[in-house]
């Protein structure tokens, strides 16, 4: 039976392992179709063609599978994904989320700098060399994508490198995978409140690993965990999506401005490290305090809402 004919929530009661297989199968199947898109462009691929391929592959891997799975696994798919319309009404939480990501930029740079100091044992030298080569290849391709100086090119890059990954990856890692891990894993208790730590950290590790950028693994994993906790605290996937978008869009816009103004991008990336190490430390402290304050604020707000509703 085709997806269009399948009733909502048809596999809602399916075993956890069956759902995992369905999700993996949908990703593989759609990715295979997306991979075929490369043959519709002239070879060798131009940067514009590569951007089209990236758009198609990102949509196939991260955007469509979560939507399909949510439809098959729940009678209320948007609510299951935590993206239902009323969840947009998050008041000041959106501003909190954006400010946190802006303040955290030097701290993210510092964590990335520390991550890059990682060295593997001598017997793993071939693996380390492969990791460095992969990292450099990814960096070169990213810089080619970002190498635009027109506002039209900037808008395309924001769509391709900020908006699409933010929506697709959050639907995948916080929407689907965190839900699956949450069902399978045992809930740990923190001060009497159920918080799915296992689900949050497992999805965060996979989120970082899928990028195949090993020297940025730690900061990306920590961001993934933060996005997971934000989802739990607010009950809305739109907050992690907004934070993810803010982080990616900042990088795209900074690179664009650097090209137009002739800035040294390496110095921009080094903010919070070396000569500005103090800024990275201050940023980290403010970010941690901000996260704690956000959690207290949302906890109190949720408690107030429950009292007002008579629960």
Question: How does the language model describe each region?
Answer:
Residues 23-34, 95-119, 232-249:
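Hydrophobic alpha-helical membrane-insertion segments
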Residues 26-37, 62-68, 101-104, 277-296:
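Hydrophobic core of alpha-helical transmembrane segments in multi-pass integral membrane proteins
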Residues 33-75, 93-102, 122-133:
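Alpha-helical transmembrane segments in multi-pass membrane proteins
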Residues 50, 80-164, 183, 309-311:
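Juxtamembrane helix-loop-helix connectors linking adjacent transmembrane helices
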Residues 63-74, 154-181, 286-297:
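Transmembrane alpha-helical segments in integral membrane proteins
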Residues 168-202, 229-236:
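Membrane-interface helix/loop boundary segments of multi-pass membrane proteins
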Residues 201-271:
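Functionally important transmembrane alpha-helices
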Residues 245-311:
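C-terminal membrane module of polytopic membrane proteins
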């Amino acid at each position: 039976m085709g997806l269009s004919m399948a009733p909502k929530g048809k596999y809602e009661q399916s075993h956890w392992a069956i759902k995992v297989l369905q999700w993996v199968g949908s990703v593989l199947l759609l990715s295979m179709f997306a991979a075929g898109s490369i043959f519709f462009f002239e070879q060798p691929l131009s940067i514009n063609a590569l951007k089209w391929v990236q758009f198609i592959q990102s949509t196939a891997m991260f955007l469509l599978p979560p939507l399909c799975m949510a439809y098959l696994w729940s009678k209320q798919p948007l609510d299951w994904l935590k993206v239902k319309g009323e969840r947009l009404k998050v008041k000041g939480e959106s501003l909190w989320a954006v400010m946190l990501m802006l303040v955290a930029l030097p701290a993210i740079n510092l964590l990335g700098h520390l991550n890059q100091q990682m060295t593997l044992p001598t017997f793993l030298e071939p693996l380390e060399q492969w990791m460095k080569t992969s990292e450099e290849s990814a960096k070169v391709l990213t810089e080619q994508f970002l190498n635009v100086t027109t506002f039209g090119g900037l808008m395309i890059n924001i769509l391709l490198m900020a908006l699409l990954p933010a929506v697709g990856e959050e639907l995948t890692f916080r929407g689907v995978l965190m839900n699956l891990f949450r069902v399978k894993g045992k809930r740990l208790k923190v001060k009497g409140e159920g918080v799915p730590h296992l689900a949050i950290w497992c999805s965060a590790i996979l989120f970082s690993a899928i990028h195949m950028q090993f020297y940025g693994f730690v900061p990306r994993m920590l961001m993934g965990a933060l996005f997971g906790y934000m989802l739990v605290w607010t009950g809305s996937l739109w907050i992690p999506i907004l934070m993810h978008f803010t982080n990616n869009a900042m990088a795209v816009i900074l690179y664009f401005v650097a090209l137009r103004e002739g800035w040294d991008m390496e110095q921009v990336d080094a903010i919070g490290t070396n000569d500005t190490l103090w800024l990275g430390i201050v940023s980290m402290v403010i970010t941690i305090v901000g996260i704690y304050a956000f959690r207290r604020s949302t906890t109190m707000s949720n408690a107030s809402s429950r009292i007002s509703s008579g629960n």
